[in-house]
Design a protein with these regions (language model features):
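Short, glycine/charged-enriched secondary-structure capping and boundary segments
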Residues: 19, 43-46, 128
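Glycine-rich FAD pyrophosphate-binding loop
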Residues: 6, 18-41
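Conserved N-terminal helical subregion
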Residues: 48-128
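Short alpha-helical segment within the catalytic ATP-binding CA
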Residues: 14
Length: 128
């Protein structure tokens, strides 16, 4: 089977990783109009619950994320000059660019074809 993914953002990359793991013989190609090191947007934050989903679905992605993201489990809530610290709510975060680099790395490790600076104007080129 051949799968073409249009868009090399986090969703397209992670879909490609999980699909390639589930169907290793599948030929998956991602087409992204920007360069591999381009990034738009700011930071990305995941909760502990989301991290547990990464761990259950792709431990390699989880390990990369935990090794490169900042992690915290305390939050300060301030109101009217009073600050309250809340613990037990784990989060991790990084720049969007870092997340894209990690997911691109995982795609390559799984054998996903990545095509950058590939503006797709006509989907018929992918018809079989």
């Amino acid at each position: 089977m051949k799968i073409t993914v249009i868009g090399g953002g986090p969703g397209g990359l992670y879909f490609s990783i999980l699909t390639k793991k589930a169907m290793p013989d599948c030929d998956i190609s991602v087409y992204e109009r920007n360069r591999a090191d381009d990034s738009f947007g700011f930071g990305v934050v995941f909760s502990d619950e989301t991290l547990s989903e990464f761990l259950s679905r792709d431990p390699q992605s989880y390990d990369l994320i935990r090794s490169r993201f900042a992690y915290w489990d305390e939050l300060d809530v301030a109101r009217d000059g009073e600050k309250v610290r809340i613990t037990g709510n784990g989060f991790c975060g990084c720049s969007r660019k870092t997340l894209l680099q990690l997911l691109q790395q995982r795609c390559l490790e799984e054998g996903v074809n990545l095509n950058f600076e590939a503006n797709v104007d006509d989907l018929s080129q992918f018809a079989d």
